[in-house]
A protein has these predicted regions:
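N-terminal "assembly arms/tails" that initiate or stabilize quaternary assembly
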Residues: 1-65
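Short, glycine/acidic-enriched capping/hinge loops at junctions between secondary-structure elements
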Residues: 50-55, 79, 397-398
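Core alpha/beta structural scaffold of self-assembling particle/tube/pore-forming proteins
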Residues: 89-92, 96-406
Length: 406
């Protein structure tokens, strides 16, 4: 009963994690399973199509995203048999909720860190919270252009100060009275506003952008090192050069390359007014002023085939690389996303033998699993208890998300 109650508390405490795709697998609880096992989440194939009567068979290329269940997080506490005599509601409030809240915040924080480091599209101004709805609508436009459906599963996750800024900015505008009432009474954006569900999460992660304002970056799109002409990959390792000064790129920094335009995944045409494709740096690297430096970015630069995501209007031996920010600004990275952008996978942990109590609760619909293990200490009538979860995060369709810098 206590284990099931703990699982329900966890579901209620999750914020960011409640808005993403969640997967649960019970195969890892078998004897011999090891922490670090990997799930491969399949992604649907994509086709180009042919005009005219002639047959043109395309290969079926189904891709997958590995989700490594590498994080076992737990909260350890103890209570007495007298505590167990309390009603379940009292026990939940005094013991379970504080313990599970720590687990929920850890899961959310890890998820938001993963989202920040894997989301390339970005809007806003680093260091300044957005004051207009246009910033969030532009983020939504990126989702539209990348093929995200408007199916009621879009969400906007904001940190407290960003949320306070936008609510204050919109308080006098023409908004349905029920939305105004909700904003006034709760101090938050209405749940279903501007085409997305708004949620506040204090675990939104800040990006400290690299500081290299005096450096000029370039990429030789003529040689196109790391560019992929067909097929699929999640990242590309491209070659950058720096002049004037070295450039210390940080994980999570965003860059664009002149002449490399983003395309819609279905019609493969540049969207918007020929917007440049955003790329996120996946690992810290310093671009030297001599020679070229390999920089790994996401998404991969795919110029043709079924998974084409860029078009090259022209090439250059020194295409200008423009950073979103290069002044070392610290900026909370709020997230506008579709539910399928990221995935959280949970798995069962084995139940140990020789203990006072070992229980596990899991729910495939919720995509969650939790284990509670208790031992009895006869000397002082105490019951040491640990609550464990095993989970992993991965970007499923990171192009269906957009960071909102604040």
């Amino acid at each position: 009963m206590i284990t099931n109650e703990a699982l329900m508390v966890l579901e209620n405490e999750l914020t960011f994690s409640s808005e993403v795709e969640r997967n649960y697998d019970d195969q890892f609880a078998v004897t011999g399973a090891k922490i670090g096992a990997t799930l491969n989440v399949r992604k649907p194939g994509r086709f180009i199509g042919t005009t005219g009567p002639a047959l043109n068979v395309e290969d079926f290329n189904e891709t997958s995203v590995p989700v490594t269940l590498s994080t076992q997080f737990h909260v350890d506490t103890q209570f007495t048999s007298q505590d167990l005599a309390l009603s379940l509601d009292m026990f939940s409030d005094r013991v379970l909720k504080p313990a599970v809240a720590a687990i929920a915040n850890k899961i959310d924080f890890d998820g938001l860190t993963m989202a920040k480091n894997n989301t390339a599209n970005i809007v806003g101004t680093a260091g300044t919270p957005p004051t207009g709805l246009i910033t969030y609508l532009t983020a939504g436009a990126y989702l539209d252009s990348e093929g995200a459906p408007r199916d009621g599963r879009r969400s906007c996750i904001v940190e407290p100060f960003t949320g306070a800024t936008i609510v204050d900015s919109l308080k006098g505008l023409f908004v349905p009275s029920d939305k105004i009432s909700s904003q006034y009474t709760k101090g938050m954006m209405g749940r279903d506003s501007a085409g997305m569900n708004w949620k506040m999460d204090q675990n939104v992660v800040a990006q400290t952008f690299g500081s290299y304002a005096t450096a000029t970056l370039a990429c030789a799109t003529t040689t196109a090192t790391g560019f992929i002409s067909t097929g699929w990959a999640s990242t590309s390792t491209i070659a950058l050069t720096a002049t004037t000064a070295t450039a210390g790129l940080k994980q999570g920094d965003v860059i664009t390359i002149a002449g490399v335009f983003a395309v819609n995944p279905q019609n493969r045409q540049a969207y918007g007014s020929n917007r440049l494709r955003n790329f996120v740096v996946t690992a810290p690297v310093t671009v030297a002023t001599t020679g070229t430096t390999s920089v790994t970015v996401s998404p991969a630069v795919i110029t043709g085939g079924q998974f084409q995501n860029v078009s090259l209007a022209s090439t250059s031996a020194s295409a200008v690389v423009t950073p979103f920010n290069n002044t070392g600004t610290v900026s909370p990275q709020n997230i506008v996303m579709h539910k399928n952008a990221f995935t959280l996978a949970c798995a069962d942990l084995e139940l140990p033998d020789g203990v006072h109590f070992a229980g596990r609760a899991s729910d495939k619909e919720l995509g969650l699993s939790m284990r509670v293990v208790r031992q009895y200490t006869i000397n002082n009538d105490s019951i040491p208890t640990r609550v464990d979860v095993l989970y992993g995060w991965a970007p499923l369709y990171p192009e269906l998300a957009c960071r909102v810098a604040a």
